[in-house]
């Protein structure tokens, strides 16, 4: 596996691969990789001639009061995992290399205003900007994103269509710990009590998945799921919403495919989880 930090160097490698008609799979990450990332890499490895993993804690998707400086990092462990999974290239750009006094950003209306966008108003502008840059730099055939960040996945699919990127966006299932907690790099922030309390998210998800087919009104489904979170003393709700899978607008009736998504704080750590119900 090769590790590259310079944009010019990776663009030259991409040019060589493209000239040989090799397909490229891109797995964008912020590092501190876990088995959830591993599942994306494995799928990319199975479907492409070349696999690139980007490892970049993107400053433009963090607000001033968020955890940019404390976000967990372990490049050595990340390299070992990627090498073991057959990654061809890890791209590790610097903030200065990716953002040289930028005046241009990529934003998406409406979709970025809902759910996480309400409490993180500039987050998805940063996500869309860095993903656009990664697409332009690596020119992937396919790009792989996890369903845990469902709003991000929906936004990136829409952005890719709107900007006419000739890239297939692949969404991959949530990978969970043995006790159900969705794998996340931010789980490392949790102390033992918070870690135990955080399982209320997956318990709420499991309840929702089990009863949604009964045809309950969205309000009743939402209330029953919220109660599980609210009964946990260490949990502080940001949101729990049932929204249309395409527009991310709240729904009252479960007549179309929906995303059931939540964000909950445990101490200083904010975790998200979701499930999709398709009709």
Regions found by a protein language model. Give the residues of each.
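Nucleotidyltransferase catalytic core that binds NTPs
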Residues: 2-234, 243, 247
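Phosphate/ribose-recognition catalytic cores of enzymes acting on nucleotide-derived substrates
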Residues: 219, 224-279
